[in-house]
Regions:
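N-terminal hydrophobic or amphipathic helices and topogenic motifs
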Residues: 6, 11-138, 144, 361-440
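Second-shell loop/turn segments in exported
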Residues: 94-95, 129, 196-202, 303-308, ...
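Short, glycine-/small- and polar/acidic-enriched structural segments
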Residues: 50-244, 250, 264-270, 287-291
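Solvent-exposed, polar/charged alpha-helical surfaces in well-ordered, non-transmembrane soluble domains
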Residues: 105, 109, 141, 145, ...
Length: 569
């Protein structure tokens, strides 16, 4: 009661006090209105003329700092899966789970939709039906635990899951061609320039693998940060993880609107990546997509125990998806409606999404698993690239042969099915001008071993062969890409030349250094063409830079051949 009485006394007050209070309130309201309405520093008064230094209010849908997406706690190590158990079909119907992605359109066409159907390819040709479910959450555990017959995943995920994933892979469904993107601040020109920056990503999917793969090829170490309060690590690319790739891009879009963004980009997939760029007022761009970088391969994963007990059913799944892929490749207009209905898209949307995938046929599948694919990543190549990209995250890597099972593909080939099909993967070019006119996607310094003071490669040095394989992989996984070999020599003796003969001798020796560096780059080019007869010589260019661009004070590092990789976008 005593407290209540005091409050009442304070409420009454004097008339003069009330008058002063009223004046104070009016003054505060006026000041607030002035501060709100006056032009913001660094921004024009007219909304249409706002500069990138001061993003327009409400750019992020009126979201406040409290509404910014929160990072998730990163998983240490690899994902834990439920215990392995065999899948048992019910009523002769196989349960398969996919995500909303046009690359799985062949399965839908073969099934005539999502629901089990006696009119499906599977029912008519092999006597079983398929029920297709769609979820965006990972389905590795349900497959492992016997709740699914099969699911769609990517090769890189298999490397992460390792021996705990009790599945076999009998089929490549296709390649993603443009769906995965790295979006960055406008001023970032290459993957190498991501060192010391932080990107938003999602963990253990193809988007994380994509950026880890690129960073690894550029020689930029990756470090996982718990949140945006962690300081960027000099010389390393920091990754902050979000619930999924769309949320990661939401976080980057939000940060773009702040005065001091803590994110330099995001890794995700369409359409969210493109929406972020379009809404950035020119502050963001697509650094690279996988349109012509074929390292994201979708595959069918089948419960191992089920596959072992039912090889004919697995053959039916493989055959049906290949047939659906054929129909979508050869007669897309006749089957767009089926795909669109399953995903809740318009036919125009379905057509656009299908343009971002390459649906694999039988000969492409056989080359994919055999490692003879010349214009894209192979099963073993992508698997091992993922092991290298994830590094210490994968404590005990599995062998890719643990998963690959080509018996169904071999059986179809013996039946002489799809004999008219050919491997048909070509570059998709959307911009004008030669690739070498722009910035390289990344550059990689390689220290080839040469005979002393010459441009002759040391033939007995095994490292040289490994380095040649590295350059070949660049050309293999990216149709239409080119490499520029830039030779460099050491500048250690420049002071000695200057002392001996002044600037005239320095200039004379600089010309010789330029020619030696060019000859060394040519030697690498010739060795590539000799080792890999199928390489198109027009995709390799050379230049000598002499001692003009030292990597530092280390003489060994200065004697190098720099490989710049230009991809088509």
């Amino acid at each position: 009661m005593q407290a209540l009485d005091r409050r009442r006394r304070g409420e009454r007050g004097s008339a003069f006090g009330n008058f002063l209070t009223l004046l104070l309130l009016v003054g505060l309201i006026g000041l607030g209105a002035y501060l709100y309405l006056r032009p913001k520093p660094g921004a024009d008064a007219q909304p249409a003329q706002r500069t990138s230094e001061a993003p327009p209010p409400g750019e992020h849908g009126g979201k406040t700092a409290d509404e910014m997406p929160d990072p998730i706690e990163p998983v240490a190590g690899t994902p834990a899966l439920e215990a392995a158990a065999p899948y048992v079909p019910k009523d002769n119907v196989l349960q398969i789970d996919i995500s909303e992605y046009a690359g799985y359109g062949g399965l839908i066409v073969a099934n005539g939709g999502l629901a089990p159907s006696p009119d499906s390819f599977f029912a008519k040709q092999y006597g079983f039906q398929v029920k297709i479910s769609m979820s965006e959450s990972e389905t590795w555990s349900p497959l492992n635990n016997g709740r699914l017959a099969a699911t769609a995943t990517t090769v890189d995920a298999l490397a992460v899951l390792g021996r705990s994933f009790d599945a076999v892979v009998p089929l490549q469904i296709g390649y993603s061609r443009g769906a995965d993107m790295v979006v960055v601040d406008r001023g970032i020109a290459s993957v190498n320039q991501l060192a010391g920056k932080v990107l938003a990503a999602s963990q253990f999917n193809e988007s994380e693998f994509f950026i880890r793969y690129l960073a690894g090829e550029a020689g930029v170490p990756v470090v996982v940060l718990r949140d945006l309060d962690a300081s960027p690590v000099p010389g390393k690319l920091g990754l902050v993880f979000y619930e999924d790739a769309f949320v990661a891009c939401d976080a980057y879009a939000f940060e773009l609107g702040s005065a001091a963004p803590r994110l330099a980009g995001c890794v995700g997939w369409t359409p969210r990546t493109e929406e972020v760029v379009e809404g950035s007022d020119g502050r963001a761009k697509v650094l690279v997509s996988n349109r012509n970088l074929l390292v994201v391969a979708d595959v069918l994963a089948v419960n191992r125990a089920f596959a072992k007990q039912n090889p004919k059913l697995v053959e039916g799944l493989v055959h049906g998806i290949l047939e659906g892929n054929r129909l979508l490749r050869e007669q897309p207009d006749a089957h767009l409606a089926t795909v669109a209905k399953a995903f809740g898209w318009t036919e125009a949307d379905a057509r656009g999404e299908l343009a971002r995938v390459h649906l694999a046929n039988l000969p492409e599948n056989r080359a994919f698993f055999a490692g003879t694919m010349d214009s894209a990543g192979s099963f073993g190549g992508i698997f091992q690239s993922a092991v290298l990209a994830y590094g210490s995250v994968i404590k005990n890597p599995a062998d890719p042969a643990r998963f690959a099972d080509t018996s169904a593909l071999d059986a179809l080939a013996k039946r002489n099915l799809y004999g008219d099909q050919k491997i048909a993967i070509a570059p998709i070019k959307t911009s004008t001008g030669a690739a070498l006119e722009g910035d390289p996607l990344l550059s990689k310094d390689i220290r080839f071993f040469f005979e002393p003071n010459s441009s002759v490669l040391a033939k007995e040095e095994p490292k040289n062969l490994e380095y040649l394989d590295t350059i070949k992989r660049f050309l293999q996984v990216s149709p239409g890409s080119t490499v520029l070999l830039r030779g460099h020599v050491d500048n250690l003796r420049v002071p000695e030349f200057r002392q001996q003969g002044g600037e005239p001798l320095v200039k004379s020796m600089a010309l010789k250094a330029m020619e030696l560096s060019r000859q060394r780059a040519l030697a690498v080019s010739d060795a590539l063409k000799e080792r890999y007869k199928d390489i198109d010589a027009s995709r390799i260019e050379v230049v000598g830079r002499g001692w003009e661009e030292p990597a530092g004070t280390d003489s060994d590092l200065n004697r190098r051949v720099e490989v710049q990789w230009f991809t088509l976008e």
